[in-house]
Amino acid sequence: QGVEIRGSELTVVAGQPAAGKSAFALATAIRTGVRTLYFCADTAAWTMAVRAIAMISGVGQDVIEQRLADDSTYGQGAFDDLRHIRWCFDSAPTLDDIDNEVAAYAEVWGADPELIVIDNLIDVSDGDDEWGAIRRTQKELKFLARETGAAVFVLHHVTEAFKVEEGSAPSRSSILGKDTRLPALVMTITNEDGYMGVAVVKNRYGKCDPSGRSPQWFTF
């Protein structure tokens, strides 16, 4: 569909719980191979390690988990393919925390990250006004993208009240907060029978289908 995750722009990927958002983000970070700063507030370090080794090795996660439990050195070679990723596992990072981590990254590595992953938006947004906090956070993350030149890749939720039809992904209108004005690219995710469906529901630079009824399907 001519989709590009662009530097200096905000990209949002939304889906219901267990739809595969984190797996999609991790695969993106691994396969692009660019300098990445990954804020993983929603998933523990152990789980991310298992997922990453499974993706790189092609071995199932249950097998990887058992092998790591038996031998903590198992999979060390796989981490050679992850050297371009730096992690932050703070469970509730603030916008100031994110700014500080980006500044520290630039100081240590001599350049800003090219990809910044935020997993996920709700864990960063705070305040009594949830929807207002989501909008404010997106505004600040868009500014961060412009300031650093990084592609800022943010995971978000859709309402669980939305019924995802077979063969479709969630619609743009089902995204929590319903405000998608700031991102250049918005994708929604679903999964069916071992396949991941990714729909482009907003695309400032190309085609999209806000209904989510035109997903592309991938094995995962």
Kindly give the residue locations of the regions a language model identified.
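Generic hydrophobic alpha-helical scaffold/packing signal
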Residues: 14, 26-29, 49, 53, ...
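Helix C-cap/helix->beta junction micro-motif
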Residues: 32, 109, 147-148
